[in-house]
């Protein structure tokens, strides 16, 4: 699996791995790259079955497989210890990595994540699946911003959204791959295992997230032994895109604090 690695800003700089959500594209994290590159070696990638890592996914494709193939690719690149920043599905992959490779994951940042899918989130995906089946890729892509962004943010950026729609449609991961990745997301359940995650965790959520209620992050915070929760008042599900200044400040402070906390505990 192809990875994109930034040059380390200094010798032995900590590594931060960015894992996007259901869309799977590493470019999702573009608003974070410039600030992270100054302090960390950053790893981005298109998830298997998407972008520049095309593949046909098995029907039983799982979050555990997503975690294993990423860890194997990191080890092959010479990276054995790393922090993880995951958004939604990416946060699930991050938790799986922390469970399966505890010696490798130094810190976990969960952005609008959850322990197991909330009934509201499931309802949103049911609607989106119906759109996919009835209207194809174009209907899925055109509806997606409604679940990602605040209404006023979208209204002020209509040309940008049109361009994003065209790009997303041109690089659509395919109906079968999308549904198999979505099914993996829906099956994931960390409610009985989260207390085994021992690395420090930063939880970031947005209070106006239409797709994932903030209660999901509260449940995560209660279940994870060493976690802290930060709530953004604005930004929607893709708060790192819509309000990168606020998000980046939270992320940079959290990573620095938790990595120091981790090293002090060793």
Swiss-Prot record:
Its EC number is 3.5.1.-. One of its GO terms (cellular component) is membrane. It catalyses: carbamate + 2 H(+) = NH4(+) + CO2. GO terms for molecular function: hydrolase activity, acting on carbon-nitrogen (but not peptide) bonds, in linear amides. Keywords: Hydrolase. One of its GO terms (biological process) is nitrogen utilization. The keyword Hydrolase applies. It holds the Pfam family Abhydrolase_1. It comes from the Bacteria. Involved in pyrimidine catabolism. May facilitate the hydrolysis of carbamate, a reaction that can also occur spontaneously. Belongs to the AB hydrolase superfamily. Hydrolase RutD family. PANTHER family: HYDROLASE ALPHA_BETA HYDROLASE FOLD FAMILY, MONOACYLGLYCEROL LIPASE. HAMAP family: RutD. This is Putative carbamate hydrolase RutD. It comes from Escherichia coli O150:H5 (strain SE15). The gene is rutD.
């Amino acid at each position: 699996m192809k990875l994109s690695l930034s040059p380390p800003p200094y010798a032995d700089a900590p590594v931060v791995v960015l894992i996007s959500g259901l869309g799977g594209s590493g470019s999702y994290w573009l608003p974070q790259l410039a600030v992270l590159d100054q302090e960390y070696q950053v790893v981005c990638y298109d998830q298997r079955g998407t972008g520049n890592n095309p593949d046909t996914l098995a029907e039983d494709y799982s979050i555990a497989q997503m975690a294993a193939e990423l860890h194997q690719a990191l080890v092959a690149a010479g990276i054995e210890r790393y922090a993880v920043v995951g958004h939604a599905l990416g946060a699930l992959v991050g938790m799986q990595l922390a469970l399966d490779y505890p010696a490798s994951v130094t810190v976990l940042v969960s952005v609008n994540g959850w322990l197991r899918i909330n009934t509201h989130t499931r309802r949103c995906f049911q609607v989106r699946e119906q759109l996919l089946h009835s209207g194809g890729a174009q209907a899925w892509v055109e509806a997606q911003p409604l679940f990602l962004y605040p209404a006023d943010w979208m209204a002020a950026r209509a040309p940008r959204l049109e361009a994003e729609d065209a790009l997303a449609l041109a690089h659509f991961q395919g109906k079968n791959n999308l549904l198999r990745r979505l099914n993996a997301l829906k099956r994931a359940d960390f409610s009985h295992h989260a207390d085994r995650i021992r690395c420090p965790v930063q939880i970031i959520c947005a209070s106006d997230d239409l797709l994932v209620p903030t209660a999901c992050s509260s449940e995560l915070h209660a279940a994870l032994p060493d976690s802290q929760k930060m709530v953004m008042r604005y930004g929607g599900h893709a708060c790192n895109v819509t309000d990168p200044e606020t998000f980046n400040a939270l992320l940079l402070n959290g990573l620095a604090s938790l990595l120091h906390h981790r090293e002090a505990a060793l």
